């Protein structure tokens, strides 16, 4: 299952400009590795009946939740729908890869906190992401240099990680660049960068 973080109206603007949506980009990234997957897409913000329009969440092997231009602290009805959908996903799907906005939603749903960046923003590239000792042991960063740059675009950051979460990487702007936590029976991997090459 892929969850689209942007509103339907914003995705239409991307399409009109000839730019891929986050979901389309994720599908291309996955297709690079395998085409032997059945992929469904959900958009909790723009689909009030999202639970009726997809399979039972227990049937999915995993979930990838991508980026968005939304700010979670704005607490709109569309954002609340995403948080609620994430909470249900964390109860019923065993593996979640949460990217950028997706990580912020996953953290919030699990009791963590997100705020505006305090030390600057990423506008194109996140520089000098340092993988810590926990990250070097984690499969998320397998064969990755322990200090790297990657595409990123974010104005917000995780300020409090969920209980029992493990910090995997940081840089000067965002202390939380990568993390891992388990909630219910779900294993959540989160990265702040918008680069989908981690897949």
Q: Where on the chain are the PLM-derived regions?
A:
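Cysteine-nucleophile active-site neighborhood
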Residues: 68-135
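Short amphipathic alpha-helix with an adjacent loop that forms part of the alpha/beta core around
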Residues: 51-59
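Short glycine-rich His-centered loop
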Residues: 2-17
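Short catalytic helix/loop segments, enriched in acidic residues and glycine
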Residues: 16-31
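Catalytic beta-strand/loop cores that center a nucleophilic Ser/Cys/Thr
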Residues: 142-185, 190
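A short beta-strand-loop structural module common to alpha/beta enzyme folds
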Residues: 37-46
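Conserved small/polar residues in nucleotide/adenosyl-binding loops
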Residues: 197-198
